[in-house]
Amino acid sequence: MVILRYYDVQAHSAAEEESVLRRLREEDGAVVSVRMERCYHLEYSAQAEHSLALDELLVWLVKQPLSKGQSLSRQPALQSTGSSQLLLEIGPRFNFSTPYSTNCVNIFQNLGYSEVRRMETSTRYLVTFGEGSKAPEAARFVPLLGDRMTQCLYTEENTPKASFDEQLPERQANWHFVPVLEEGRAALERINQELGLAFNDYDLDYYHDLFAKELGRNPTTVELFDCAQSNSEHSRHWFFRGRMVIDGVEQPKSLIRMIMDTQAHTNPNNTIKFSDNSSAMVGFDHQTIVPSSVVAPGAVRLQSVQSDLIFTAETHNMPTAVAPFSGATTGTGGRLRDVQGVGRGGVPIAGTAGYCVGALHIPGYKQPYEPLDFKYPATFAPPLQVLIEASNGASDYGNKFGEPVISGFALSYGLNSAADASQRDEYVKPIMFSGGLGTMPATMREKLPPARGQLLAKIGGPVYRIGVGGGAASSVEIQGSGDAELDFNAVQRGDAEMENKLNRVVRACLDLGEQNPILAIHDQGAGGNGNVLKELVEPGFAGAVIFSKEFQLGDPTITALELWGAEYQENNAILCNADQRELLEKICRRERCPISFVGVVTGDGRVTLLEKPAPKDLEQALNASNRSEVSPFDLELKYVLGDMPKRTYDLKREQTPLKELSLPKGLLLDEALERVLSLVAVGSKRFLTNKVDRCVGGLIAQQQCVGPLQAPLADYALTTVSHFSHSGIATSIGTQPLKGLLDPAAMARMCVAEALSNLVFVKISELADVKCSGNWMWAAKLPGEGARMFDACKELCQILEELHIAIDGGKDSLSMAAKVGGETIKSPGTLVISTYAPCPDVRLKVTPDLKGPGAGSKTSLLWINLENSARLGGSALAQAYAQQGKDTPNLTRSDVLGKAFAVTQSLLGDGLIQAGHDVSDGGLLVCVLEMAIGGLSGLRVDLSEPLAKLKNFDKSVEKLNRPELAVLFAEECGWVVEVLDTDLERVRSTYEKAGVPNYYLGVTEGFGLDSRVVLKNGKSELLDQPLRVLYKKWERTSYELEKLQANPECAEAEYNSLEYRQAPQYRGPQNVQAELTLKRSSAPVRVAVLREEGVNSEREMMACLLRANFEVHDVTMSDLLQGTASVSQYRGLIFPGGFSYADTLGSAKGWAANILHNPRLLPQFEAFKRRQDVFSLGICNGCQLMTLIGFVGSAKSEVGADPDVALLHNKSQRFECRWATVKIPSNRSIMLGSMKDLVLGCWVAHGEGRFAFRDEKLISHLQSEQLVTLQYVDDVGKPTELYPLNPNGSPQGIAGLCSSDGRHLALMPHPERCSSMYQWPYVPSSFEVSPTQSESPWQIMFNNAYNWCVKSNQ
């Protein structure tokens, strides 16, 4: 092998260098400056001649668009010149081929350069210190600049010379027998420590007896490792299934039995519950897009199907604590595969996410309630890093895979208990929560049982030494105290591009309907291959023989133990008939997804791993296992997965000392409010929503953001099941961990109350159809905690029974504690309730943003308070004053909640509610303030009525004679609704007749940031401030976090925009229906939706084209490269959005290379560009492609030619998702020309969307020739470069271009994701929409393209 190195000192922006400089200065104040340089390491076969063509291709791929001169060099530009400078280089570990390398190699191999084996990048840093300062050792800065798990320091001695394999460690011992027969239990104890198996005394006794007495032989290290994973708490849930003895009394039911029994009191609409990777319920009949072929290019069609609705949720806490970004990416990926792994295959639609971390200690933003002396485990990331990087990881994975994140929660908590200062409550071990919605064909609900002769196949990425022992590591009762290397080995790394390919394979199989070759499917998670392959053959204890040489290895040094136990990601295992092998291989080849047929079902009840290839003949494979042959794993399934004895847990209740909340005398309301608003749980979550795609897939009817300025306030999330249906899935979340510190039982009831209070504002089928996932994160095996969790679970099941709803799934994480020094810190016991329910019509909903003032209507506010109480225990107010309180809110009147839910649903269906929001974190005052923020509206609230009617006030405010504080900040179950004054009496009467307490709060008045929020108690004024002042206080913590994760200039610009923003003004067509009129054609108009690997937006594009009467064909780049399709066959060529090759080497670079550098494809595209009867459309990634191949702008399409137009990184230096306002100027486009002067909202979701041009003359030329087709505009419709109105910094707001003849159109925004009105997150009251209008004005552009094709035929 040979490695060539290329250096680029221009690869990093000034903003990136500034960000690194800030981090280094926090570590060492003597740092003056930092320069960065990228090094590309290209490894290729020594037998292959290094061609000039390969060199030129590499230069073209890595060269920055529009860069002047040649920045790439064979020699490094940065050199250390003295003792005050430090030069260090950080790159990937040699034995870990990164996803970046995988994508690079794919690009080269698709272009015929099969000799390229690997391509990695390292970063060189030249750090300069102040005069007189001596540079420290490089090791000091490595943790700040690199990822310990995947990267290492490169030095002269530690740099790959000719191959990344040359410095691999010597092959580790493959596996061996453990001498249990000779040494007894002591041998198990020793291997338990060496391998980090997390065996407790019970396990050690059990496995000693199994091997020494039952089997009479020594176990192998692979077998013991397998048992540790397969039978860990993480996998087996021993605690939830165990016998509970509390204070000497055995409880009649286990935790899991109590939970499962909730199903007896609800509608029986579950189709899957407690028995698969996800849960499911009866869904809807609808039409969906199905391809005519999944192995070749062809037309897609609409097909009627019945879909079940899927939900799943899990956490990924320990990996996220150790490595936040990687832990969150793989947590997201694992949950996605849980959706894929339901029945015979499921399809993900959208995700939810949640984060619970310790005290943040944001630099320069000190909070009085955050203790300053807290320490953290050396192997854990600090809370601030966890919150930023974990949310980055989950967002990045979803963005690249193509799953929007549309709901969630965030909490930062770390306090010394007010009642006992020695008790520290903090999320030292954090929570990373991931939930997901999806659908599954109703005919695919049941996995088929394994039968002799069937094949076991692995679909997805190759085997890596990652996630080794994660199931056991996650089951250790107290983390942070063990071997650091074992902690890091247990963490995985994610590859969203591979997950996308894997998902396409599963979906393709489902598209075959009854011919689906997948008989059963499971996702690979804890326990790796050993667990997932056994799961496939567990039914009936069928058994299988597995051949280790059939697995694709990503690391040549993988041992048998690692192959069997590593939890490497992006991998599913399937069961199929032998005669379906060829079909599956064809599907995977077309989708470029690896597949390995690794085993065969034997029917003998054993699972055997053989270290050899599989025989070609099926009968030989069935009989391949020779019992005299030594193998690393050979056990009967009954010993590993059979019913094992229940474990008994002897628990004791411990009384928690509680102390009454003590608020300062003379407390000012605005001071208390400002503190409360600064809490992560209460304030804006914009730092989360800005960076995550919330619209990809085109099925989103409600995501987090609402109102004119898209404030992240939504109470629920909502998706449709298809682009051709208004039926959908609603979901909401309830979690109240701080109340659980005081009263776990009350906390459980309040979790359900919050979840339903969030769900109430979308019209669902009925309450008894609601099902819940219950996720428990608790240090349950530590003293007192198990009993507390039991009490919470018992109360949870009671309230679910009372409400006639049920749990149908969930997960537990019972090792929520960490060792800090000699102290064990328990994370607050946390329950997350996620509801999901059928929604017959997603258009029947309301959001929190006030509507009246913006519409010029007079409206009033009603408070639905179910308990007639105002208690402050466990509240945001208590946390803001570094306390917990004593008397916590509770829901004792569940019957009233049921009635209130039913009444509100009825009023919603009758159109009598304008807006609604639940009272939760922060209490009533925050609730109404958020409604005002969402609607850019003022309000005038009078507390006279609630103060007169409420019965139970928190004792802390009684002492101060300040009952209004309890009314305003108590987090009792309830919600606030906005109603028209003309409907007020009817609405109040409806609630009162049902016995639901409701209090009149006041009126809305004033529109815009200058409006005022006025709060009174009779004639006594409590608060009177401009909305803009309170809005900025609500946004402040999010702003501080934004500065740490994006370009600080952009963060500041957005924060300061709250001084001048107003509701955006739209201008629609005079007659939408007339504009949507389609011409008649005697022949079909055929268009190709062309997708490269990593594209994720083709289905929403297909839906728009199908509505426009096109004959839509699904065509992959593989089809073009193999010659099974040609672009000459189509009248339209469509390039959808996504992340082709995960944006490796730059957005659309790899995609463009496959066109420009392929001698067969380039002439096809050049000919298509010249034809006068065809058109093309590229959106987002497709837009980036069109600039590179010369379809728009004045770029040439010759090989290697630099474009004159390029899409560069957003000014914010990160991915941006926004509902932006855009204007269509006068333009030549055949699609947008008729829409000139329209001003509309449109989804934007990209990381590299900033248009750049060769020079100013080109911009002037494009504008004068009317080739600019779309511009970002401000709130009054003028083109803007101001962030965030312009989300990427494009000059003059340019967001789209067309060719000089108007036939080729490239847009960065996503009109295909808002072509239906239900997809719009905000519609101004002045924007007239017919009640029967389902299509939005954006559909016009697709219809225009069809009409142009028909006209050009005539």
Curated annotation (Swiss-Prot):
One of its GO terms (molecular function) is phosphoribosylformylglycinamidine synthase activity. Disruption phenotype: Pupal lethal. RNAi-mediated knockdown in the fat body reduces energy storage of both triglyceride and free glucose, increases waking activity during the day and the night, reduces sleep bout length, with total sleep bout number reduced during the day and increased during the night. One of its GO terms (cellular component) is cytoplasm. ATP binds at residues 327-338, 407-409, 714, 920. The active site is at C1180 (nucleophile), H1310, E1312. Gene3D superfamilies: 3.40.50.880, Phosphoribosylformylglycinamidine synthase, linker domain, PurM-like C-terminal domain, PurM-like, N-terminal domain. It comes from the Eukaryota. Mg(2+) binds at D715, E754, N758, D918. The keyword Kinase does not apply. This is Phosphoribosylformylglycinamidine synthase. The gene is Pfas.
